[in-house]
């Protein structure tokens, strides 16, 4: 029997046959990367802006957790970021279990510290502000914007320059269907610690 995988829709059966056998839908999914789903799948007008310490996006709508995780920080006041919210969560399953993800800037958290979440859990509402959002790998402490700098090998703070740790997260997002950032092909700065997904 022939099988086809089209954008997460898996069909089984004899495709194109003239007999009465119809393709059978086995599963429908958004996931492309192992164990993770597109956390920005319900963001309206999603615009990838750049890679820096993380990945910046414009748009508005609901933001989900990348995968199974536990919320480690959730505040509606800026944790050193412009625009508002600060959320971090530690992945508990999948190939990057143990790593922490941050979501910052124009977001309002709808989760609480200690809450267990999955890729089906809305963790924040992204609002159409002047800053958009930034998301990426966080240090374990994950308390403020400054916590990103040492790990990313930051280039004097925010700027239009991609970092290796930012590209690592951007490639993970691409693997689950998020559009690529426009500056991803520029020379990356900083270091990528050994325990983070390598850049492809």
List the predicted regions and their residue ranges:
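N-terminal cationic amphipathic segment used for targeting or macromolecule association
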Residues: 2, 10, 15, 136, ...
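Non-catalytic surface loops within mature trypsin-like serine protease
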Residues: 27, 59, 93, 139-141
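Zn2+-dependent peptidoglycan hydrolase active-site motif and core
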Residues: 65-110, 127-137
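Local beta-strand/beta-hairpin segments that build beta-sheet-rich folds
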Residues: 123-124
